[in-house]
Curated annotation (Swiss-Prot):
Keywords: Ribonucleoprotein, Ribosomal protein. Belongs to the bacterial ribosomal protein bL31 family. Type B subfamily. The gene is rpmE2. This is Large ribosomal subunit protein bL31B. Gene3D superfamilies: Ribosomal protein L31. The keyword Transferase does not apply. One of its GO terms (molecular function) is structural constituent of ribosome.
Length: 85
């Protein structure tokens, strides 16, 4: 493997700002902000807007849109009665 062409891989703390959930993982991304982890070491912190702890798909709070067709949506939007009524 060639030297000095690969990004540096190190441990970082990913912090979900929505739920304050933290997890330690390896990454090539870095930050000037650091935080102490449970093992007593300081690691760079990467702030996330969403993670598996706050994403609706993983938390079970996902909403499914109604499966209306295009004609039904058009009729509803412009106040027409559907043919089924």
């Amino acid at each position: 493997m060639r030297q000095n062409i690969h990004p540096e891989y190190h441990n970082v703390i990913f912090l979900d700002t929505t739920t304050d959930f933290k997890f330690l993982s390896g990454s090539t991304k870095t930050s000037s902000e650091t935080m102490e982890w449970e093992d007593g070491n300081e690691y760079p912190v990467i702030r996330l807007d969403i993670s598996s702890d706050s994403h609706p798909f993983y938390t079970g709070r996902q909403k499914f849109a109604a499966a209306d067709g295009r004609v039904e949506r058009f009729n509803k939007k412009f106040g027409f009665k559907s043919s089924n009524e």
